[in-house]
Amino acid sequence: MLNLTVGAPANGGSCVARHDGRVVFVRYALPGEVVVARVTEERGSHWHAEAVEILEASPDRIESLCPIAGADGSGCCDLAFATPASARRLKGDVVANQLERLGGHQWAGEAEEVGSTGATGWRTRVRLDVATEGAQAGHAGFHRYHSSDLVTELSCAQVPEGMLSGLDGAKWPPGAQLHVALDEAGARHVVQTGPRSDRKASTQVVEGSYEATQRVGDRTWSVPVTAFWQAHRDAARTYSALVKGWAKLTPGMTAWDLYGGAGVFAAVLAESVGESGHVLSVDTSRGSARAARAALADLDWVDVLTESVRRALGTQRRRADVAVLDPPRTGAGREVIDLLAAAGVPRIIHIGCEAASFARDVGLYRGHGYAVEELRVFDSFPLTHHVECVAVLSLA
């Protein structure tokens, strides 16, 4: 055990402390606190640890809002012990640091609240794993932090009341996964996938249907429970409105919706460019692409392509006036951003759910002559260290 004085927040949910000249990344602690920490991993010049006792607490510390999270619990809500307002400030500090170090861009601010749900009960989609061995075998649960071990109590504070009711008492095939979604009306849909047998994973609807209906604006989507949809109940509406305003499209223009999922952004882009324009939505997920084609079937000027973004960009002959990107946590990366720059796309809206990846992508754009016009950070995952960053960039 180590007695540590905790310093500034780091990306990934830890704060930085020092012990005998070595950097220690401490989870479940806040800046300024003095804690007793248990070392969980040693990596030469730095260690990872978790606070197990608070000797001097920050005024921002509260009793955890999540009953199952913490050093000896689930890894679900790793900031549930901080006031929501202080957590938003902390997340803003982390994003600012990553942008300066990795993106060469100066920004100051804090994460903004999304919608009016508050810090708890905001999640609409959950994936649970089923334990394969021991006393927990056959029971569904959340993973402990960076562990294959599961916490089979399902009272995570992110989850609305009743969303997981009854699932903890049931027995499931070991190694399976449960996908749970709430639709627009609040009805629950549960789909079991796996376990894998002879390289194939079975899919079974346990409750409700295979697709959950979601609504953004005047349009409805039927999205597979196993496919991607924004986790926060108000996120899709928030980002959609922002993209529409920042795109500054006019009738007849062309827009690319890259990593487009079910086509939520394609819908608002299509409204702006009208029948004389063109929108291309690209995603590798067949389920998401099917949902996009169904939801946008009345918009003849929208094409939905099931393909990698890299390959799709290599085949386009018509330059986009605006490109919207919402890549996975790893970011868009150099190859995709090089292709966008080579295509001469004058305006780009980039969305990222991991601060370091987002900052690196911003740096890549800047290397091609793009400048950040505006940047906002959203607290789209309350009680956790995760954020959603959105930037609009234009060729200088």
Language model segments and positions:
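Short loop segments at secondary-structure junctions
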Residues: 133, 395-396
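Short hydrophobic/aromatic beta-strand or adjacent loop that forms the aromatic wall/cage
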Residues: 123-125, 386-390
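S-adenosylmethionine
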Residues: 305-387, 394
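Accessory RNA-recognition modules of RNA-modification enzymes
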Residues: 1-325, 330-338, 344
